[in-house]
Amino acid sequence: MTKAKYKILVCPSDRTGVSKFRSVDPHIRLQEMFPEDFWIDIDYAPKCEDENFFKQYDLVQFHRSIGPDFAKSQKAIEICKKLGIPTVCDIDDYWMPTVDHPAHAIVKENKLDHMITESLKIAGHITTTTKVFAQEIKKLNPNVFVLPNTVNPRERQFQPKKIDSKVMRIGWLGGSSHLKDLEIL
C-alpha cells in the first residue's frame, strides 16, 4: 500500500454520542471512500506534549479539546501551530449550558465553559452544527464552518420499521442534555 496523501489525527471526546457522529464515523468513512488520499488515526488519549508524535500528521481534528486535559490540549494546539499542522475543533453544543441542563453544575464547578472558550480561541479552524451557532462562535474565532449533524441512514438503528397504520409518527434523536428542547415540540 502506498502512503496516503494526508494523515489525520482524530481526537474524540468520548466513545459515544457526539464523538461517534461528528468525529469517528465521518473520518472512517472518509478513509473508506478515499483510501489512497487519507489515513485516519483515532486516538482518545494522544501524547499531547510530544512534538514528535504530532509531526506525523497533516491535520488534527478534536472535539472541544485534544484529550481530556484542557491545559495539555492547549499545549498540543500550540505545538501543532509551531509545526504548521492545521487544527480543527468541532463543537456541537453551547459551552455555557443553562441551569436546566443536566451538566450545568459540573461545567461551572470545573470551569469547563472557560476551558472550551480558550480552545475555541486558539484552534486554527472550528466546525459546528448550525449557522446560528457559527455566528456565536465567530465572536471568538472567525474560522468557523458549518457541518450539520447527520446520521448514517444505513445503520440498523436508523432503519424504519414499517407499521401498517394511518397514524403519523415523528422520530426525534438527542441525548439527555436536549430534554428541555422537547418542550418546544
Listing of model-derived features with the role each one plays in the protein:
Residues 1-67:
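N-terminal pre-catalytic "stem/leader" segment of glycosyltransferase-like enzymes
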Residues 27, 88-117, 154-157, 164-166, ...:
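Acceptor-binding helix/loop patch of EC 2.4 sugar-transfer enzymes
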Residues 76-82, 106-125:
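Membrane-proximal helix-turn-helix segments that form the acceptor-binding/catalytic region
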